[in-house]
Amino acid sequence: MSSSPAQRHTRKTQIGFVSSRSGDKSIKVTVPYKSPHPLYHKIVNRQTVLHVHDEKNEAKLGDTVEVMETRPMSRLKRWRIVSIVQRAVTTDAVAISETDVAAQVPTKTTASNTPAPAEQPAPQA
């Protein structure tokens, strides 16, 4: 008995962001969602953390990824990466010396090293 593609169940997909790199080929993806509070009916922000298999080690911290449900890969991993939706914006750290920092930071001026303002004569009426 073979099943046609129309009868086959589709797998669940979720979109979330990479919150942790927990080892080789393993990441944690946080999927945010909103749900109403059962008593007060206020919309509450919640999140689910999924353990995801990253075969190529291509996802970085902060990336937005699409994950799909799959067979169990390990004790906790039941999801795998389908695609990276958006890369995280990263800034490269630049080494600077203390003299560069001192030149850019303004210094405090005190009354002892600033000249006194000149007095203006009062206008005559």
UniProtKB/Swiss-Prot annotation:
The keyword Ribosomal protein applies. InterPro entries: NA-bd_OB-fold, Ribosomal_uS17, Ribosomal_uS17_bact/chlr. GO terms for biological process: translation. Keywords: Ribonucleoprotein, Ribosomal protein, RNA-binding, rRNA-binding. One of its GO terms (molecular function) is rRNA binding. The keyword Transcription does not apply. Pfam families: Ribosomal_S17. Residues 1-21, 101-125 are annotated as: Disordered. GO terms for cellular component: cytosolic small ribosomal subunit. Part of the 30S ribosomal subunit. HAMAP family: Ribosomal_uS17_B. NCBIfam families: PRK05610.1, uS17_bact. One of the primary rRNA binding proteins, it binds specifically to the 5'-end of 16S ribosomal RNA. Belongs to the universal ribosomal protein uS17 family. This is Small ribosomal subunit protein uS17. The lineage of its organism: Bacteria, Pseudomonadati, Verrucomicrobiota, Opitutia, Opitutales. The gene is rpsQ.
